[in-house]
């Protein structure tokens, strides 16, 4: 499948809570979670090289509609609800349409 919709979030954890935030975000790959959906073709959790409490999440979806539908579900909302308590402030969100590139993990 091809990702026609991408989503990126930059989240800053409370000091020293970056590991917990990463662990929570990685549960998004568990069976029944958003990243395990057939419509999610990219789910990448990364950290800032200079600040371990800054975490980036990049997602690629088959469509914007699929992204919104899956994230409206119970599993996604449970993760989102738990994230709030780990954050130092507001997160940055960006959505975009891929043009071309490569991901080889």
Where is each model-derived feature located?
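An amphipathic, aromatic/His-enriched active-site/gating alpha helix that lines ligand/cofactor pockets
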Residues: 27-41, 60-94
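Short, surface-exposed ligand-recognition loops at beta-strand->loop->(often short) alpha-helix junctions
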Residues: 12-25
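Short coil/turn motifs at secondary-structure junctions
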Residues: 14-16, 62-64, 100
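Short, well-ordered beta-strand segments in beta-rich or mixed alpha/beta enzyme
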Residues: 5-11, 42-71
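A broadly tuned "polar low-complexity/structure-edge" signature
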Residues: 2, 18-20, 32
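Glycine-rich beta-strand-turn "strand-cap" elements at beta-sheet edges
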Residues: 1-5, 42-53, 79-105
């Amino acid at each position: 499948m091809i990702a026609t919709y991408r989503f990126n979030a930059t989240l800053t954890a409370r000091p020293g809570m970056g590991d917990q935030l990463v662990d929570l975000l990685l549960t998004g790959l568990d069976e029944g979670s958003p990243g395990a959906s057939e419509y999610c073709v990219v789910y990448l959790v990364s950290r800032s090289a200079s600040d371990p409490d800054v975490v980036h999440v990049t997602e690629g979806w088959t469509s914007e509609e699929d992204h919104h539908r899956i994230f409206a579900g119970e599993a996604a909302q449970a993760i989102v609800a738990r994230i709030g308590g780990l954050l130092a402030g507001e997160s940055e969100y960006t959505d975009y349409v891929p043009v071309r590139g490569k991901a080889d993990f």
